[in-house]
Amino acid sequence: MSPLAWKIRLSLGVKGLTWQSVQTPMSLPKPDHFELTGGYRRVPVLQVGADIYCDTHLIIRVLDRLHPSPPLSPPGQETVEHAVSRWAETSFMMVILSFFGIGGIFAEDFVEDRQKTMIPPGTDLEGASRIVGSKLIQIRNNIERLEGMLEDGRSFLLGDTVSAADLSAYQGGPAQYIDEQLRQEFVIRNRPGARCAPG
């Protein structure tokens, strides 16, 4: 599932809203999705009645407007919330998602689709999967940044209540899929004999 779709699911839960979802294909073609969105290919998409909202940040604003309590973008902290969310959805999320290249988690058609639209030409995907050590350091650095924001004892990144910044920083959606691979990587790094283990 898309990490941004995961964020919107969490947002709906924080607000205590009843909702339904549909799964769309990860790669083209997406005929039902395109018909709904007028050609917009990304997820998530929010439908409220006859209105369709694309873009995660817009969806958060719409949810806050339609259901103000609790606010996902706290009044007076909108700029900070947006900055932290943007950081979490780029720097932090991208390093987590880089692990998806390890072990062929994604279907070949998905990788081909993303190579056409998101990955710069000439990117060595196989080589990228060999730089696990540096990616683990980046993950640790990002987690330390988050911990630094919480050093003063606050419960959440922007204060005492959960915000969209927290939901963006929570990487449980994508991380649950790479957890086993990360564990395996640590085993291989710490116990070279594990590489030769039968089975």
What are the residue ranges of the model-derived segments?
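GST-like fold's C-terminal all-alpha helical module
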Residues: A88-R195
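GST-like domain detector, emphasizing the conserved glutathione-binding G-site
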Residues: M1-Q115
